[in-house]
Curated annotation (Swiss-Prot):
Family the entry assigns: Belongs to the adenylate kinase family.
Name of protein: Adenylate kinase
Taxonomic lineage: Bacteria, Bacillati, Bacillota, Bacilli, Bacillales
Protein origin, superkingdom: Bacteria
Positions that bind Zn(2+): 130, 133, 150, 153
Annotated AMP binding sites: 31, 36, 57-59, 85-88, 92, 160, 171
Catalytic activity, EC: 2.7.4.3
Enzyme class per UniProt: transferase
Amino acid sequence: MNLVLMGLPGAGKGTQAEKIVETYGIPHISTGDMFRAAIKEGTPLGLQAKEYMDRGDLVPDEVTIGIVRERLSKDDCQKGFLLDGFPRTVAQAEALENILAELNRSIDYVIHIQVDKDILMERLTGRRICKNCGATYHLVFNPPAKSGVCDKCGGELYQRADDNEETVANRLEVNIKQTQPLLEFYEKKGYLRHINGQQDIEKVFADIRELLGGLQ
């Protein structure tokens, strides 16, 4: 099974990726992991990517696509893969189609974990961290016993700057704009399947399992 996983920040993509990989025994391939592995192996493309990353620049598409091609050609991808964080653009999606055609493969499904923006805001702005011991809480899902105080050490809880409403709203807006053309591309291809990410974790995964039931 050849899968692409999509979802906005806070949609629970990471949790579902772990469950898919554990259940179906396919590799979880994220862009960051691919870059790190290529750099560690010292491949020509990995070294090129490192140069850009060391300068703080974006790695250009031709390098990223080359690394994806190398990764998908490895033995552990013969029975399938779960791509996460790639593609990010229609140009990358078209390049992925070409790579898979070279390998006589095709995408089975693009799984889009769908969550309303207001729920994503609640999930992403609710995090609180202890200034003293670093313990993490969530005002809705994992609140401290006493408001603003760490259960473990009594330290003060704070909200990280990038978890505030304005920053989170901007981050979501940027992601929505970037994601929309990609969703439309995969909708036209017939690969796209929406999964309701507003349910509890096990129900979300049950829906994914039902979708994947016919695939080997």
